[in-house]
From Swiss-Prot:
The active site is at residue 151. One of its GO terms (molecular function) is hyalurononglucosaminidase activity. GO terms for biological process: carbohydrate metabolic process; hyaluronan catabolic process. This is Hyaluronidase conohyal-Cn1. Residues 413-424 form the EGF-like domain. Expressed by the venom duct. Hyaluronidase catalyzes the hydrolysis of hyaluronic acid (HA), an anionic, nonsulfated glycosaminoglycan distributed widely throughout connective, epithelial, and neural tissues. In venom, they are known to enhance diffusion of the venom by degrading the extracellular matrix. It comes from Conus consors.
Length: 448
């Protein structure tokens, strides 16, 4: 993962645009924190698993802090933050996998590893090694979030720029060796075509193996989907890899903030655009139960905790747009043995005073809204933040249900995949035999 730096000026305006939060008593809300078996998963013919009725929005801890090793308790469960048992990094709730077997890449010294390019990938035991690594970390009956993290090159040829330009250059060189008579335009066109196919073969195969080893997990790649220069370019590029959205059973974009100089509205727009693009590809291409969990950084590489106002953008806006939850990630570099005691005490205090109460507030509000206007069968989406329906249609749906609870008059329902109707009041006809379902990670379907 990459670092993010806090912009200290994000205070009044951004808070207003992120999420209006009622002042809940943080001690009053309850939250389930463990998975249970469910019908309907990425490995089933009947893919209609549901989250628990009290958890339309979940916050998942994926921070390798190591505080439990010194017996310093982080009060995650007090605020409904989901975490792996024994606080392991690879566990039953979430697995972010940096090592998924051999990949082709070019080292910093220019050495071609495993062929260097996807087109030249030549590892003799790729599948076997990938399977062994995944099985080594496989929890029993895994139903959690499965995240493959590979960032050395990108699936879309044209997005390998900056330090990754070498992959475009070497791809063109490879074609030229085979076809010295081609002009530059044709060389580039063929190089792009060969790259796209080879990258697809490798990434799709890794994903397939993960889904076979842990078929009930929600599998996808970190940083996919992402946004580019503008919405037109973003759609064009991401549609080129629609095969990835069709195969993924989890979408894990990043909403880390890198640029100090961005204005408050620009930062809010970035988060909105990124989550919105995930909603779009989920609607157009992904299985109906595919959850969206943006990755959120709450502590920078410079060891600065994000202010509450900044976290409200990341958590609040994701919730308002209908994401299934967020993943909280941080670096382990601050939690080395020499400084771990002090760092863990600082982290404990941050959770108690800032992060924890905010998580409780956001999750409780989305729970209350779901129960009030969606009968607990869907997520609430803010009328001004539905990238699929638009504000006019959102308001029409809102008027049908929000009269039940005026507090949520600016929200409408996005039903879970087993339900339909403006207020998610009708069980959809299904070839599947219904039973009590508790898929804690379910993504929910969008209303057509």
């Amino acid at each position: 993962m990459r670092a993010v730096v806090v912009v200290t000026g994000l205070v009044v305006v951004v808070v207003a645009t992120a999420l209006s939060l009622p002042n809940h008593d943080v001690k009053s809300a309850t939250s389930s924190r463990s998975s249970s078996d469910y019908q309907g998963s990425s490995g089933d013919d009947c893919d209609e698993g549901l989250p628990p009725p009290d958890q339309p929005f979940r916050v998942v801890w994926n921070h390798p802090d190591n505080c439990e090793r010194i017996k310093l308790h982080l009060p995650l469960d007090d605020y409904g933050i989901i975490f792996n048992k024994l606080r392991v990094f690879l566990g039953e709730e979430i697995q972010t996998l940096y090592d998924t077997g051999p990949w082709p890449y070019i080292s910093e010294t220019g050495k071609f590893i495993n062929g260097g390019l996807p087109q030249s990938f030549n590892h003799p035991d790729n599948d076997g090694e990938t399977q062994r690594i995944l099985k080594k970390h496989r929890p029993e009956n895994f139903t959690g979030l499965g995240v493959l993290d590979f960032e050395t090159w990108r699936a879309i040829y044209s997005t390998n720029f900056g330090p990754m330009t070498i992959y475009q250059n070497e791809s063109v060189k490879l074609v030229k060796e085979q076809h010295p008579d081609y002009d530059q335009k044709k060389l580039t066109k063929v190089a792009e075509k060969e790259w796209q196919q080879a990258a697809k073969d490798i990434m799709s195969n890794k994903l397939k193996i993960a889904q076979e080893v842990m078929p009930r997990g929600h599998w996808g790649y970190y940083l996919y989907p992402r946004t580019w220069d503008n919405k037109r370019d973003t759609k064009f590029r991401n549609d080129k890899i629609n095969w990835l959205w069709r195969q993924s059973t989890g979408l894990y974009p990043s909403i880390y903030i890198y640029d100090f100089s961005k204005t408050e509205s620009a930062i809010t727009k970035f988060v909105s655009d990124t989550v919105g693009e995930a909603v779009r590809v989920q609607k157009e291409f992904s299985p109906p139960n595919t959850p969206i969990y943006p990755y959120v950084m709450f502590q920078t590489m410079d060891n600065i905790f994000h202010y509450e106002d900044h976290l409200k953008i990341s958590l609040g806006l994701s919730a308002k747009m209908g994401a299934a939850g967020v993943v909280l990630w941080g670096t382990s570099k601050h939690y080395k043995e020499s400084t771990r005691q002090w760092q863990c005490q600082q982290l404990q205090e941050h959770i108690r005073t800032v992060l924890g109460p905010l998580v409780k507030n956001v999750t409780q509000m989305m729970t209350d809204c779901s129960r009030a206007i969606c009968e607990g069968h869907g997520r609430c989406v803010h009328n001004s933040h539905d990238v699929i329906l638009g504000e006019t249609e959102s308001q029409r749906l809102s008027d049908l249900c929000s009269t039940r609870q005026s507090r949520f008059r600016d929200y409408h329902c996005r039903c879970y995949s087993a339900w339909e109707g403006a207020c998610c009041q009708t069980l959809r006809p299904s070839r599947c035999q219904k039973r009590e379902q508790r898929n804690v990670h379910g993504g929910g379907d969008l209303i057509d």
